[in-house]
């Protein structure tokens, strides 16, 4: 799926967060937003996901203008993962069961074995299924959320500081897996490790 922004701006409480931003991502393209702190990286991802609407300009998903009437449809085509990684309460297993019971996800039948197969790629063990989500470290939450992106297999990934706080090996694994994915991916990150892989382009202010 393609993403295109035309002169997008966003202002809140009189403060201009994003101004006249235009760019496009072709299907399967991957780009990193590496702007300084406080310049609207996370806000941009939320605008594309439809959490809020631009003050000015237009956002297109597959050449369709994102608006109130189609935002729910397009959200089902996107996975949004952030550094907070808010997971349902209970054990990780119960949390996964709840997520895959949602109407948008219930078509994914064999999610348990798929998740289990992916755990080793992000250096987690199957013992994590028995942990309570409230006991997980930030890094464990981030890696689980990234696994969810892979299992949900939606055509667009929006990744907000997905490598923040991870060690070098885990960062490298995540970067490699994102680079190898077929999805259209937009990443918000300060991490310079993304520049070490030529699969990614960079969006400037």
Where are these regions (language model features)?
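Helix-to-loop junction immediately C-terminal to a conserved catalytic motif
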Residues: 49
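Conserved ABC transporter NBD signature motif
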Residues: 57-65, 74
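Q-loop/switch helix immediately C-terminal to the Walker
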Residues: 84, 90-107
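Conserved ABC ATPase "signature" region
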Residues: 110-128
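Conserved ABC ATPase signature
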Residues: 132-136, 140
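Hydrophobic anchor residue at the start of the ABC signature
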Residues: 146-147
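ABC ATPase C-loop
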Residues: 150-151
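Catalytic Walker B motif of ABC-type/P-loop ATPase nucleotide-binding domains
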Residues: 157-161
């Amino acid at each position: 799926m393609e993403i295109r922004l035309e002169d997008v701006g966003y202002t809140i409480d009189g403060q201009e967060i994003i101004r006249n931003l235009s760019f496009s991502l072709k299907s399967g393209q991957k780009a990193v937003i590496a702007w300084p702190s406080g310049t609207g990286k996370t806000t941009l991802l939320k605008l594309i996901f439809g959490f809020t609407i631009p003050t000015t300009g237009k956002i297109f998903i597959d050449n369709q203008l994102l608006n109130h009437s189609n935002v729910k449809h397009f959200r089902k085509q996107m996975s949004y993962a952030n550094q907070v990684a808010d997971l349902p309460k209970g054990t990780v297993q119960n949390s996964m069961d709840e997520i895959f019971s949602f109407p948008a996800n219930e078509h994914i039948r064999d999610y348990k074995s798929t998740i289990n197969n992916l755990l080793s790629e992000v250096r987690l063990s199957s013992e994590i299924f028995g942990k309570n989500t409230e006991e997980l470290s930030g890094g464990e939450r981030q890696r689980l959320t990234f696994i969810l992106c892979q299992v949900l297999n939606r055509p667009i990934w929006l990744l907000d500081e997905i490598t923040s706080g991870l060690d070098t090996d885990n960062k490298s694994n995540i970067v490699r897996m994102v680079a190898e994915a077929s999805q259209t991916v937009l990443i918000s990150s300060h991490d310079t490790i993304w520049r070490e892989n030529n699969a990614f382009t960079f969006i400037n202010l």
